[in-house]
Amino acid sequence: MEDRGRETQMPVARYGGPFIMVRLFGQDGEANIQEQRLYELLSDPRSALGLDPGPLIAENLLLVALRGTNNDPRPQRQERARELALVGILLGNGEQGEHLGTESALEASGNNYVYAYGPDWMARPSTWSAEIQQFLRLLGATYVLRVEMGRQFGFEVHRSRPSFRQFQAINHLVLFDNALRKYDSGQVAAGFQRALLVAGPETADTRPDLRKLNEWVFGGRAAGGRQLADELKIVSALRDTYSGHLVLQPTETLDTWKVLSRDTRTAHSLEHGFIHAAGTIQANCPQLFMRRQHPGLFPFVSAIASSLGWYYQTATGPGADARAAARRQQAFQTRAAAECHAKSGVPVVAGFYRTINATLKGGEGLQPTMFNGELGAIKHQALDTVRYDYGHYLIMLGPFQPWSGLTAPPCPYAESSWAQAAVQTALELFSALYPAPCISGYARPPGPSAVIEHLGSLVPKGGLLLFLSHLPDDVKDGLGEMGPARATGPGMQQFVSSYFLNPACSNVFITVRQRGEKINGRTVLQALGRACDMAGCQHYVLGSTVPLGGLNFVNDLASPVSTAEMMDDFSPFFTVEFPPIQEEGARSPVPLDVDESMDISPSYELPWLSLESCLTSILSHPTVGSKEHLVRHTDRVSGGRVAQQPGVGPLDLPLADYAFVAHSQVWTRPGGAPPLPYRTWDRMTEKLLVSAKPGGENVKVSGTVITLGEQGYKVSLDLREGTRLAMAEALLNAAFAPILDPEDVLLTLHLHLDPRRADNSVVMEAMTAASDYARGLGVKLTFGSASCPETGSSASSFMTVVASVSAPGEFSGPLITPVLQKTGSLLIAVRCGDGKIQGGSLFEQLFSDVATTPRAPEALSLKNLFRAVQQLVKSGIVLSGHDISDGGLVTCLVEMALAGQRGVTITMPVASDYLPEMFAEHPGLVFEVEERSVGEVLQTLRSMNMYPAVLGRVGEQGPDQMFEVQHGPETVLRQSLRLLLGTWSSFASEQYECLRPDRINRSMHVSDYGYNEALAVSPLTGKNLSPRRLVTEPDPRCQVAVLCAPGTRGHESLLAAFTNAGCLCRRVFFREVRDNTFLDKYVGLAIGGVHGARDSALAGRATVALINRSPALRDAILKFLNRPDTFSVALGELGVQVLAGLGAVGSTDNPPAPGVEVNVQRSPLILAPNASGMFESRWLNISIPATTSSVMLRGLRGCVLPCWVQGSCLGLQFTNLGMPYVLQNAHQIACHFHSNGTDAWRFAMNYPRNPTEQGNIAGLCSRDGRHLALLCDPSLCTDFWQWEHIPPAFGHPTGCSPWTLMFQAAHLWSLRHGRPSE
């Protein structure tokens, strides 16, 4: 490549045609973390690698490959230049400034050293590249072959040029040990790879160990046909629906939003359905593996919540560099998974993180292993399928993107959330458009698998007839480019096997019947095609099922066969047999030896061990320490159903024991009373809605409780006892949850075992023991998945079992969390153990040389404890509570003190040996009660043969309060909460060192988060802070369209917020709008949701460009925006960009008139990336100016309220630097990021209260106030049960929050100012 933006013609290599390569440069302003680390190393005069460099200069480097040559005719060159400009526009270039240009800030001359690097052009495009290419394809671009974003940095060298040792450092720190590539001048002259293809192995890896384990557990030849999972499951047939080991829990309150409804009176209904919890454990697991594995169990399941957990080897090594490298790898792998889930529109509500030292049993050879659980909702009619038969169509959903280094840091090839979101939306729409049984095959292999294994799982008999012209475009193009010598049967078979059948991919495969009655005028294939078209989901009709075995390919490249002709008789051009099941000879498993010679390691008796030193080591251990670097950087609340996510208390600390996911967020009247007539709104005003006294309604929220339990190290020590301890942890995590009936608790076990170390009898014994234990606990049990370490990792003895609890729940008051509530209350502990150090405990791992056998408590004692505490919770006696798990009793108490930010004084009896008492991990609970209730609680527990202990007292609130432990007259520990919080957060701080820029990590404001207590609620003071819940029929005079862009999810909160405000709400997909009158019947337009693309700013600009590309859609929206009787609201990153790009907000001008093209370059603002460089999920203060013109915020003027703020680009940059002042004077600023003070001028200026540190504006409105765009999302917190923490100013409300007023105000405004649309 040549420098400085000059076009360089490249000869043909991998790409089979002429092309030119263009370099564009964009000043980034600061070096990234890796470049800064390298520069510090090279500039350190004490380092052997020191170069005495000049100032570091860094910039982005965009490489664009374009079809053609400079000798092409002028029209072609003009079109190529237009597409190149389009790439720049999508990446932020505007009329008033360019973020990318041809001039570089670096000069590769003299003593300047310049280093350019990025994704490998000789490998498949990165995920970011694939997604921008998808946008360009939708926008009609044909000349852009590939786009990659790299980096370039440089500095002046005063000494010698970099040597081999310096290049080694660059390779390790910047290139991640060759995961990225150095770009040399002319490097791509050798060609580049355009296609999203990865060559698979010569033969598909059938994972015989994985297949064998699944046959043992779920039935098959290796198990002699027995299905242990079915034999050992414990369910109640009266309460559950199940097929095999899959257990479905029924519900009557699933939100259903109709698609293309012809009923003008309703668009929402509550339907019967089922809830299903699924999960799997996989080594080096694809980030979104469970998202497509779940449809392999139930094809029309909709994910509503997920959970993540990780197992890593402790970051150790011969030196600090090795440990830092291990920490960096872990940080990037977990970040990639967290951000993939953050972009998927499904909230992550539970998780864990465990490290095991390589010197311990189970730690040697441990590969990064991830647990991914998912809670899905299924409509009752969506369970029906048809019998598999010949003559059914084979369908592949989603773009074909074979895996390549998914988990290799810095993860440029991580999975595309956009692709998975589109697939899930397409399946949901397909179910609605064709509500009749039609799917005959949907099974998937149990682990990450090649395409040929997926196809084999679909076919219980016979084989498949596939057509080459219907294969994915990249595969088909590769076949078309084969020369005559290779375009033979064997040659094509080799190519198809290498690039289609043998690679692993992220697609969903199903078979559907050919015939069937038309529904709504559509056949099955037509309905599926329409659903994929609306969802923006690529799909391929690959062929059909046939009696002939194997995969039979028809060469129809010259004359493509239509889908209607696929059922005709064809002669295969070549046939590929399904891979044979590899049978292994019998071999003795490695014995699971455990040293049971000791009950307690003597190491804890050493005089140098003190409570304070032990506590410091345990609180800073990754297994116990804060996981805020994960929880606060993934989606926690999208969709609006989450009532309890991991963060609790005024500091939003990730300490919740359980999650609660509501089945519906749409209001109903108490007692099942019918809704009021919609004409009730005619008598309403904002004043009446705010000042109306609460009606004493006991609002109940029903949903599902989710918890996790895992004891990976203890399972490695003793499979049976470790499994029981995981079950105990999952159950006790649910002890304080609002469970309707303890008998409805469902425990699902996910096994991760190695058949080479545990044979069939060992697995059967462990499963039988688990079944017996569940029966003793009085809960239901099923087995969800079985997996094993990767083939080749024979050195690893790691095994684990993850237990998940799901149970129907219901609450009407505040949820019980670890947040201490009241000064002077008492703490009571109840444990199921003898007070000795538990075998396999974290204390033993850190301070003992001997691994002792763990012991699980008796099932009866655990059952009594769980049910007794559930009874106390229902009686209202318990104020807060937490389970005793990793780190023992003292860790539990510290976490409760930190969650509530209250001092605690603990008193241990003189006669006790307090050290083992403090760190014993025997399952138990600690809970807070008022002093007047202690006698009743103790009597209740003792009557059930439990022995509670009153541990101490809760103190005052504040970060400088003390946590004290007294052993008789001696104070053995006294530390401030501020110091304990720093220790507990130290692991997260280490991870942040690899993830956030140094200037953020070292900022004095980085810990200024939470305490959103001081609220300026003057407009609501003296009035009911919970607005009235007015439940009416949908008002046909106020119809609101929720615009759903392709690739987006999470619109349910917007739909529910407007429905609860009495509006008639419908989803509108881009492809539905076919003329400019489509929106004429609507008075409201809402834009929101989460886009699956990795680059949020790119997704927003591309969405505006897609709207502009469709004249009908563009003119319908512009016509709507210009009508004086309409309002619009845009929430979140995507919504703000779309409304600003359409000209509705961000300037004092009106939107363009219908028929006028929208110029994306003229957008008055662009989104600024977060200062952390990470996705943020924060509970932040938002202030609404008293003078804002917004009609929706009229009732909240002057308020400071907390709100959910989520995204990667949460700041506004105006192309006109003076525009903020113009908008302020025109009263068009809708809200600001605010500090924790009440003064109107105390805006937040620093991260994290201001995520980008780019100004403080968080929302804008139009000049007349009708159009509103907010970076925060009030639809996620319209009810108080959706709030992360309720400030004391609100007391203990259970109704709707002040944010409800903005949606009710929109309804009232439309009735007063709008044109009735009835």
Swiss-Prot record:
Q: Which SMART domains match?
A: GATase_5
Q: What is its main location?
A: virion
Gene Ontology molecular function terms on file: phosphoribosylformylglycinamidine synthase activity
InterPro entries from the entry? Class_I_gatase-like (IPR029062), Herpes_virus_tegument (IPR010077), PurM-like_C_dom (IPR010918), PurM-like_C_sf (IPR036676), PurM-like_N_sf (IPR036921), Tegument_herpes_virus_N (IPR024346)
GO annotation terms (biological process): intracellular transport of virus; purine nucleotide biosynthetic process
| Result for mutant: K461A | About 50% loss of co-localization with host DAXX in PML bodies
- Give the matching SUPFAM superfamilies: Class I glutamine amidotransferase-like (SSF52317), PurM C-terminal domain-like (SSF56042), PurM N-terminal domain-like (SSF55326)
> What happens when you mutate Y390A?
About 90% loss of co-localization with host DAXX in PML bodies
Pfam families, A to Z: AIRS_C, GATase_5, Tegument_dsDNA
Localization annotation: Virion tegument; Host nucleus
Q: Any idea which UniProt keywords this protein has?
A: Host nucleus, Host-virus interaction, Late protein, Virion, Virion tegument
Query: GO CC terms for this protein?
Result: host cell; host cell nucleus; viral tegument
State the family named in the UniProt similarity comment for this chain: Belongs to the herpesviridae MTP family.
Task of the protein = Tegument protein that plays a role in the inhibition of host intrinsic defenses to promote viral early gene activation. Interacts with host DAXX and thereby disrupts the complex between DAXX and ATRX. Suppresses the DAXX-ATRX dependent deposition of histone H3.3 on viral chromatin allowing viral transcription. Targets also host SMC5/6 for proteasomal degradation in a CUL7 and calpain-dependent manner to support nuclear membrane-less replication compartment formation and lytic virus replication.
- How does this chain assemble? Interacts with host DAXX; this interaction disrupts the chromatin remodeling complex ATRX:DAXX and thus allows viral transcription. Interacts with host SMC6; this interaction targets SMC5-SMC6 complex for proteasomal degradation.
Return the PANTHER family for the record: PHOSPHORIBOSYLFORMYLGLYCINAMIDINE SYNTHASE
Query: What is the designated name of this protein?
Result: Major tegument protein
